[in-house]
UniProtKB/Swiss-Prot annotation:
The keyword DNA repair applies. Coiled coil: none annotated. The keyword Ribosomal protein does not apply. This is DNA repair protein RecO. Involved in DNA repair and RecF pathway recombination. InterPro entries: ARFGAP/RecO (IPR037278), DNA_rep/recomb_RecO_N (IPR022572), NA-bd_OB-fold (IPR012340), RecO (IPR003717), RecO_C (IPR042242). Keywords: DNA damage, DNA recombination, DNA repair. Belongs to the RecO family. It holds the Pfam family RecO_N. One of its GO terms (cellular component) is bacterial nucleoid. It comes from Rickettsia felis (strain ATCC VR-1525 / URRWXCal2) (Rickettsia azadi). SUPFAM superfamilies: ArfGap/RecO-like zinc finger, Nucleic acid-binding proteins.
């Protein structure tokens, strides 16, 4: 059987000399892995993590790993490799997708979101965009945070906390008596115009990390690339 789609290469593992297993996050078919052969310098350039490719997958049976071929559509390598913030953000993004999405599970809407994020990242690193990516990823995996209004009073102003149980925002007055048990809602997530302080970056990292750990990273397993990214950002801001 054959699968044809457009996708982003998110992983590449050596199998034997000049032969690799790549994992591609495709628009209409989710994650697909296949064996590729690098027979030329051109093919080595094509099979790089982050490249957007036309993807062809072939196998006798659907459950087989299959053989893959790709044609390059766009490469982001040159944009990311010269900037550590961009590179670490990119590594974190593809690592999270690889960790949290199941093989051959469709995520077509999120694919479009990813392409838009990579395009923006290639132009400029923005911490707000990165955290919004993580929030979108949580929503895509079934754990959407409602940060638009207070989960108790439904007011949309003076939001200050997030409930770890309901994943909903809480106003300052509602949350104050329980503040030691709540997560802080970073102010920059409520306004696109606000400056982002170092403390707000820590708060944002803690916020999304809590829900990743509670619902998605089982047995204390975490995405190492995300840890590297966050450590870099928090130590260089």
């Amino acid at each position: 059987m054959n699968i044809k789609d457009v996708g982003v290469i998110i992983a590449k593992k050596p199998l034997k000399e000049n032969t690799f297993i790549i994992t591609v996050f495709t628009k209409n078919h989710g994650l697909y892995s296949g064996v590729v052969k690098e027979s030329s310098k051109k093919s080595k350039f094509i099979y790089q993590e982050g490249n957007i490719v036309d993807f062809l997958w072939q196998a006798r049976l659907h459950e087989h790993i299959g053989m893959a071929k790709c044609e390059l559509i766009k490469s982001y390598t040159g944009y990311f490799i010269i900037n550590k913030a961009k590179l670490y953000a990119f590594n974190s993004v593809i690592s999270l997708i690889k960790e949290l999405f199941h093989e051959r599970e469709e995520h077509s809407n999120f694919f479009s979101f990813l392409i838009n994020y990579l395009d923006n990242l290639s132009k400029n690193f923005c911490f707000r965009d990165y955290i919004n990516f993580e929030l979108a990823l949580l929503a895509e995996t079934g754990y959407k945070l409602d940060l638009t209004k207070c989960g108790v009073t439904h007011v949309t102003t003076d939001l200050n906390y997030v409930s770890p149980k309901s994943a909903r925002a809480l106003s300052y007055e509602v949350g104050k008596p329980y503040k030691d048990k709540l997560l802080i809602l970073p102010k920059f997530l409520l306004s696109d115009d606000s400056e982002i302080t170092l403390e707000e970056k820590r708060q944002a990292s803690t916020l999304t990390n809590y829900f990743f750990n509670r619902y998605l990273f089982h047995n204390n397993r975490q995405a190492e690339a995300r840890q590297i990214f966050m450590e870099y950002i928090l130590n260089n801001s």
